[in-house]
Amino acid sequence: MTEVVKIYQLVENLSLEVVYGDEESLNRTIKTGEISRPGLELTGYFNYYSHDRLQLFGSKEITFAERMMPEERLLVMRRLCAKDTPAFIVSRGLEIPEELITAAKENGVSVLRSPISTSRLLGELSSYLDGRLAVRTSVHGVLVDVYGLGVLIQGDSGIGKSETALELIKRGHRLIADDRVDVYQQDELTVVGEPPKILQHLIEIRGIGIIDVMNLFGASAVRGFMQVQLVVYLEAWEKDKKYDRLGSDDAMVEIANVDVPQIRIPVKTGRNVAIIIEVAAMNFRAKTMGYDATKTFEERLTRLIEENSGE
């Protein structure tokens, strides 16, 4: 599933100024996250013109255009306006050539402007569009922000995922999505999760029903999206099954083509799963900062064995 981005949504989310744009042009669809800077095209070379991309004008493009004759400038600007060109965006709050506005009006293409630098604007455009246009898949589970770490709680139906998430919310953590989490790959190492719009801020608790977390706990108890950094899989305790007691098993699970660390927590009466997840999140963060309690224990054990063997 891929979302659609309209020009007016880009304007609202990136606080862009609309220099020209009517209802039809602001409803044009952006189909790719790639951004084009039409430098060669201003010289008249259109062989490889990416007409279906947003066209970004920085100080180099504007300065070059200003040195052209008005008739030549208008001709080039008209050639830049294709049927599927989403919009023109000018950075640094630069003055926009009248010929660009004229050509845009003739072809129903919006002209937008931003006060920020070209490189920064390019980064913001790419980041926003890559996130919105990324292919999304859905996974079953509950995504919670635990101490700033995106923890995806998974497990069999009825194991207590939502109840555990509710306990975490009561302890000051934040809900991103319950039951169904829409995930997408942001880059090679990053997967992001968010709720479907219809389930935003909602959590289902058996015996109570649907709860609006933001209404009950406030805006600080929810957030719109989060990187999935750790997967916690809840499973029913089995008496004869051997569980990892040292934390030396580095299991991974693939989500949206990204490998994410996973830990499995056996659930049984008397275990406070919410607190265990809190500790798991803190321990995971400690590992990413270079401290591994398991390795420390193994080193101590090795030293003790060596000392005893030398006596």
Swiss-Prot record:
Gene3D superfamilies: HprK N-terminal domain-like, P-loop containing nucleotide triphosphate hydrolases. It catalyses: [HPr protein]-L-serine + ATP = [HPr protein]-O-phospho-L-serine + ADP + H(+); [HPr protein]-O-phospho-L-serine + phosphate + H(+) = [HPr protein]-L-serine + diphosphate. CDD domains: HprK_C. ATP binds at residues 155-162. Transmembrane segments: none annotated. Residues 203-212 are annotated as: Important for the catalytic mechanism of both phosphorylation and dephosphorylation. The Walker A ATP-binding motif also binds Pi and PPi. Belongs to the HPrK/P family. Catalyzes the ATP- as well as the pyrophosphate-dependent phosphorylation of a specific serine residue in HPr, a phosphocarrier protein of the phosphoenolpyruvate-dependent sugar phosphotransferase system (PTS). HprK/P also catalyzes the pyrophosphate-producing, inorganic phosphate-dependent dephosphorylation (phosphorolysis) of seryl-phosphorylated HPr (P-Ser-HPr). This is HPr kinase/phosphorylase.
